[in-house]
């Protein structure tokens, strides 16, 4: 899914926080979004994901609008955003909403838990999880629907290196297997170099030059 942003503007209280004339995220590529705090990175992902619909400009998804592709887009939030339920129930939730067969739900959830090393957490409640556990569950939940576009807001911020490696591997594996378009906000230049095919640099809501990062 190619995602194209045109003449995008977002304001809060009269102040422009995002002003992007033209930006294209290539289909099947992993794109890193970097920049200082307050640069508009999360705002951009919120708009692309459909969370924030109050903006000027256009966002196209391989020539379609959001209403036609919203079931194919999912986002992992910086703090997970899990429901107050068990790990299994969290991962299964989007599949249940879609009316997926119970046997398929069971198989999908078990496979994802195994892939992310969280099988032993199946019955554990979300509020009892560590930061690294929370992010792995959040990623599993996002991947359960097999999205064509996966948006990630600092998915490995402040977690142990071993969990970071597991999450990064899962992201890359999914991209290679599904050819999904993946956008990832990160403050780590090393992570951007490890994972990303392309880099977008945001500063004060505008796209800047990212030369020299690779």
Swiss-Prot record:
Binding-site list for ATP: 35-42
Could you tell me the EC number(s) of this protein?
7.3.2.6
Molecular functions (GO terms) = ABC-type tungstate transporter activity; ATP binding; ATP hydrolysis activity
Q: Which UniProt keywords apply?
A: ATP-binding, Nucleotide-binding, Translocase, Transport
User: Which SUPFAM superfamilies does the UniProt entry name for this protein?
Assistant: P-loop containing nucleoside triphosphate hydrolases (SSF52540)
Which reaction is recorded as catalysed by this protein?
Answer: tungstate(in) + ATP + H2O = tungstate(out) + ADP + phosphate + H(+)
Is Transport set as a keyword in this record?
yes
Which residues belong to any copy of the ABC transporter domain? 3-214
Protein's job: Part of an ABC transporter complex involved in tungstate uptake. Probably responsible for energy coupling to the transport system.
Q: State how it assembles.
A: The complex is composed of two ATP-binding proteins (TupC), two transmembrane proteins (TupB) and a solute-binding protein (TupA).
Q: Which family does it belong to?
A: Belongs to the ABC transporter superfamily.
The protein, known as:
Tungstate uptake system ATP-binding protein TupC
């Amino acid at each position: 899914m190619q995602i194209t942003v045109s003449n995008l503007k977002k304001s809060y209280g009269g102040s422009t926080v995002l002003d992007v004339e033209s930006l294209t995220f290539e289909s099947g590529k992993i794109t890193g979004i970097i920049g200082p705090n307050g640069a508009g990175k999360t705002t951009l992902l919120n708009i692309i994901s459909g969370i924030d619909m109050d903006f000027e400009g256009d966002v196209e998804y391989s020539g379609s609008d959001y209403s036609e592709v919203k079931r194919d887009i999912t986002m992992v939030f910086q703090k997970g955003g899990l429901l107050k339920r068990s790990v299994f129930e969290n991962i299964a939730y989007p599949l249940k909403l879609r009316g997926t067969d119970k046997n398929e739900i069971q198989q999908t959830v078990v496979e994802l838990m195994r892939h992310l090393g969280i099988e032993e957490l199946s019955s554990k409640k979300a509020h009892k999880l560590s930061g690294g556990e929370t992010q792995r569950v959040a990623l599993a939940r996002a991947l359960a629907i097999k999205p064509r576009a996966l948006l990630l807001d600092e998915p490995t911020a402040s977690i142990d290196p071993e969990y970071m490696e597991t999450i990064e591997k899962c992201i890359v594996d999914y991209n290679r297997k599904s050819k999904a378009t993946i956008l990832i906000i990160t403050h780590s230049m090393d992570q951007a170099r490890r994972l990303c095919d392309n880099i977008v640099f945001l500063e004060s809501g505008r796209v800047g030059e990212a030369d020299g990062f690779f």
